[in-house]
Amino acid sequence: MEDLQTRIAALSPKQRALFESRLRAAAAPGPDPAIPRRPDDDGPVPLSFAQHRLWFLDQLEPGRPVYNVSASLRIGRPVTTEAVRDALGALTRRHEVLRTVFPADGGEPRQHIADSLTPPLTETDLRALPDSARAAAALRLCAEDKQRPFDLSSGPLLRCLLLRLRDDDALLFLTFHHTVFDGWSIGLLRRDLTALLHAAETGTDAGLPPLPIQYADFADWQRRMLDEKRLGELLGYWRERIRGAPPVIDLPFDRPRPAVATTEGARRRFALPAELTTALRDLAARSGATPFMTMLTVFAALLHRWSGERDMVIGTPVANRARPELDDLIGFFANTLAMRVRIEPGMSFGDLLAQVRQTVVEALARQDLPFERLVDEARTERTLTHNPLFQVAFVMEDGRDASELDTLLPERARDTHTPDSAKFDLTLVLTDRESTYTGYFEYNTALFEPVTIDRLGERLALLARSVAADPGWELAALPVLTRDEIRHLKEVNAPVADDPRHHRTLHGVLEDSARRHPDHTAVEAPDRQLTYRELDEAANRLAHHLLALGVRPEQPVGVALDGTADAIVATFAVLKAGAVLLPLDPEYPAERLEHILRRSGATLLLTQRSLAGRFAGNDVTTVLLDDDATRAALADGPADRPGLPIAPDRLAYVIFTSGSTGVPKGVMVPHRGIGSLTRSAEQFAQTPDSRVLRFASPSFDVSLLELLMTFDAGATLVLEPRALLVPGEDLARLIRERRVSTVLLSPSALSTLTAGELPGLRTVVMAGEAATLELAQQWCDGRDVFNGYGPTEATVLATIARCAPDRVPPLGRPVAGYTVHVLDDTLRPVPFGRQGELFLGGVGLARGYLDQPDVTADRFLPDPSGTEPGARLYRTGDVVRWGADGELEFLGRTDHQVKLRGFRIELGEIETRLEDHPGVRTAVVLVRGEGSDRRLAGYAVRAPGEERPTAAGLRQWLRDRLPGYMVPELFLVLDALPTSPNGKLDREALPDPLAQSGDTAGNRPPLLDPVEERISGIWQEVLGIAPPGSADNFFEVGGNSLSATRIIARVNQAFGVRLPVRSLFVEPTLSGLARSVSAERAEELP
């Protein structure tokens, strides 16, 4: 048995395919009758199912060379053009399919076989060129020839290029449309052409075996053989196999998937070492699997580790030549099988190989079902965005069928000389040569950069080496990080040199600046100005006063003051007294303020007379800093520093942030984190001449960064009451009048300002929300613009990036002292390009959540890679990835990724595309509704000076740029988006578009217009359905690719237009198709 497995494993892919097909045929109940010849007068010749699939794809995207295939024959002797031409004519006489074209009538194609055909032959003499130039010229000419499209209706579907390389050396390069030629045909072509060429040169008989049938006989037989009973059996199996499969596989693309898929592609080649190839073949033999099964499993494991997908469909071609009558017949017989792979938690590579082996055996036994029938029966959403059922393919070729064109240049050099197309997002093509596996990744260049695919080749070799050595590897643990990636992660997370400046407390920063710049203005508020000496002394007096009131270490003290110098004095006084700062925003609802005070345990509150009434019902002692008695007591108090020893682990402040349950949770931040904050502030390079606006709400931790970056530089902090800090013209006027040079704003707030109107604003720091390309383009001209990222749990900022006008602002790299980790759901590092959840580590982490140990344990985890005892990681809930340049890119929130109708959707991607609309300043997308009624809803704010966009206009804008499943059904155009007191978007306050009516929400009237009525009648006749409504989708009411061509033919005839088949995929609803008709008719009017 072991010897048999070894012999099977040693078969070439072509031998193996033939063996498996014959084995399956031998297992059938009895011998099938031979395929009969078709009577000459039996009416129109039908297309085979495979031909019809490619004919339809050509109708969908006419004029594309993506389904051009080629073969070549090296002629190592002098040869005459006449002999080549005679051999080609004899070849087409032997194989009718090479004389076939596909005219159509009423959207129904048929085969038309010409009586005779001598293929077009172009001859080019390259003999005068040097060797290297000759090879390059030959490759270029062949590549250009392969990219020329064919006309399927008129043909011919074969053309030839004769390249004379030397007097005794020539290359015959043939390009076919795939409808008449497949990979299996390459060997037959070489055999037949070699014999026919020799016969033409010598005047002898070629000695080729007679063909019992022609391709048209096969096509007719296939249509008859696959009767309803057999089709039902096959469909039953395949429907069950793909039931519930995700419609797309989400790979780590470098660019968003375009609304209409392109076919521009490229190839990146690789070769597995001989010893690894041998080990993989041995693994196949030990596992009772073929090399094809083994390498398909390796590919599936690679896709899982690279993308995180657990349920995927991988397409693979099969020769589909089980009948002996087809052995010598050139033509397109190949079918495509959809191999579904499902990965369970804890599964090993060996487990997956056993699953794949079973899947392949079952699929080969049922390979007769035409792929297009499966697509139609699956009722998958038909779109021009991606291939149905699968977008990733795997091919394993026999090395003996490799193109003789490959001998002209070294393997690596071929990629640069062979511009190509890509049928799918990604295809792995392996060639099984005697000593090694070589191959290439064919990829869509609209989605991937070459460097990403090169890294993928490295990952393949890493993973293959691991499983060849031990198939017991858990899939989730398989190594796929390249050496460069590992080196980068070590560099960005490397420990930093110790610096005493980074051990200071926040009030220590103030004290240092008071020594260096005692008479420089520290605070400029509407009520008064304070120098650094005055601010330090005022904070000292208040700190002594607090100590006299009995304030203890780590006792929370509330501070609720609005835009006055006292607000800054109180902040530093609480810290100098060794207490815990509890900043409160007076604009918060009374219920929220009461909850924070009660939950924090604060018994002392520093506020002002105008705000005292807001806290009257709370059980706290109130100190009114603007009260005359308080002022007098403070004036008589000591101005020296209390000088209390404060350990780094003592709490500095507690800030309450929104909780997922709606109840705020208190984040406890120790003084240790201020050192990390100092490192952050240093990157903004402020000077004593800088004037920093205090914009953030005091209950938002960015307000502390505003203080630190100002006072560490000896600069001036500009204060205004919160009521005047209104984004828009009021804020712009304030920045001009107060000569503000530096701001820290949320992108929402920054988007309300115009860069050209604020020339004095020299430093802009964006934080708190995802920054946009539009903001970078507007503000990066001549300014220092930064994107800062960091949750409250990591002391304000953990990463910083300097922005550039030509890219979406990234999160950048970690601030010194922090570590960043992009992990999967098993808490393992993910490869570059793949999205994962961001975890933060380092000295800047908060202690946890106040009185919530369970929540703390859930969000703060032990750091398995930490070098210090007790090292922890904070789970941010943010979805990021490492970009190709080694910077972190923000993708969204884990709770902002949704799944609708099987599609995983990142709402932020839709928002970004909406904001690209010239009439939209900012946008938000949510999911509204419940259960099966869940729908995407888009909200847009009109851009200043632009016409108010309509729901229909926004919908069409997105349709032109995004897949259909990412286009919201509902739209609301608003004057402004609701925000919370800290300037962030308040999603909960957005209105429900389901309650709106008219064009704003995108609702359509139910009545049909005359064009819709006429199209409705055509749908009823062709599909045999009840009258459809204007919003009905063609593919959801029973339409498929077969009926789509007939529908479009009928519509074009009825309205005198020339719509392409693709229009039904762009606008699959009845009303959408009617709009396309009306637009086409309008264009044709004089």
From Swiss-Prot:
Family in the record: Belongs to the NRP synthetase family.
Purpose of the protein: Involved in the biosynthesis of phosphinothricin tripeptide (PTT), also known as bialaphos (BA), a natural-product antibiotic and potent herbicide. Adenylates L-alanine and loads it onto a peptidyl carrier domain via a thioester linkage to the phosphopanthetheine moiety. Shows weaker activity with aminobutyric acid and L-serine.
Region: Condensation, residue numbers: 45-484
Alphabetical list of InterPro entries matching this protein: AA_adenyl_dom, ACP-like_sf, AMP-bd_C, AMP-bd_C_sf, AMP-binding_CS, AMP-dep_synth/lig_dom, CAT-like_dom_sf, Condensatn
Entry's free-text remark on domains: Modular protein that contains a condensation domain, an adenylation domain which activates the alanine residue into an aminoacyl-AMP ester and a peptidyl carrier protein domain which bears a phosphopantetheinyl arm to attach the activated amino acid.
Phenotype on disruption: Mutant cannot produce PTT. PhsC cannot take on the function of PhsB and vice versa.
Transmembrane feature ranges: none
Positions of region (Adenylation): 510-901
Molecular-function GO terms, alphabetical: ligase activity; phosphopantetheine binding
Start and end residues of each stretch annotated as Disordered: 22-43, 983-1007
EC numbers for this chain: 6.2.1.67
A Pfam family annotated for this UniProt entry: AMP-binding
Designated name of the protein: Phosphinothricin tripeptide synthetase PhsC
Segments forming domain Carrier: 1006-1081
Functional pathway: Secondary metabolite biosynthesis; bialaphos biosynthesis
Alphabetical UniProt keywords: Antibiotic biosynthesis, Ligase, Phosphopantetheine, Phosphoprotein
The reaction(s) this protein catalyses: holo-[peptidyl-carrier protein] + L-alanine + ATP = L-alanyl-[peptidyl-carrier protein] + AMP + diphosphate
Modified sites of kind O-(pantetheine 4'-phosphoryl)serine: S1041
